[in-house]
Structure formats: structure tokens, C-alpha cells
Regions:
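A charge-rich, low-complexity, intrinsically flexible signal that marks solvent-exposed coils, linkers
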Residues: 1-109
Length: 109
């Protein structure tokens, strides 16, 4: 094998590792975000875990983050009368959860 081939294989391995870590971070972020949203809706325990799983499933759909944000905004409007969290605050929490996911997984940003 030439050094060029070695370098190419190394770059491919690095790319795959980065993709895997990004996937794990997004999945962890969605779980943390789902638990946060569940707590805002007054859910706890198994109900909160189930809600977090619903959001994780929504995130893997066609529209990804936008589907998650739309679901949360709709649920907040439908279930949490008087809850005053606007879209900007919700997106800020999503970013906080991503940072926490990176921290928990030991991923440098």
C-alpha cells in the first residue's frame, strides 16, 4: 500500500467516525431536549421518557429538527396553557442540549 492509499483510508475512517459521533450527539441531544420539553409540560418518569422517544422518532423523519420544533411548539400550545416559551427560547434550549450531549459523549466542538 502506498502512503497515498494509507492517507486515503485514514481520511475515510476519520470521516466515518465523525459521522457516527455526530449521529450519537444528535440522538443524545434529542433525548435531552425531549426530557426538557416533557418537564415543561409537567410530565415525569415514564411519561417523560415516552415523550422524549416520540421526539427522537420525529427527528429521524423527513424534516428532522424542524419536525421536532413544530411538535414541541404545538404540544406547548395545546397542553401548556399560559406557557410562555417562544420559538427563540426553544431553539436556544435545543442548542444547550446539543452542547450537553457533546460534553456527555466527550466530543470536542
Amino acid at each position: 500500500m502506498t502512503s497515498f492509499e494509507d492517507r486515503e483510508k485514514g481520511e475515510e475512517a476519520k470521516f466515518h467516525l465523525e459521522q457516527e459521533l455526530a449521529f450519537k450527539a444528535r440522538a443524545r441531544r434529542n433525548h435531552l431536549f425531549g426530557l426538557w420539553a416533557a418537564s415543561q409540560l409537567g410530565l415525569s418518569g415514564e411519561a417523560a421518557e415516552n415523550y422524549a422517544r416520540e421526539l427522537m422518532t420525529a427527528a429521524f423523519g423527513k424534516h428532522g429538527d424542524e419536525a421536532v420544533l413544530a411538535k414541541i411548539e404545538a404540544d406547548f400550545k395545546a397542553k401548556a396553557v399560559g406557557l410562555t416559551l417562544d420559538a427563540a427560547r426553544i431553539r436556544m434550549e435545543l442548542e444547550r442540549c446539543l452542547a450537553e450531549a457533546h460534553k456527555q459523549l466527550g466530543i470536542q466542538r
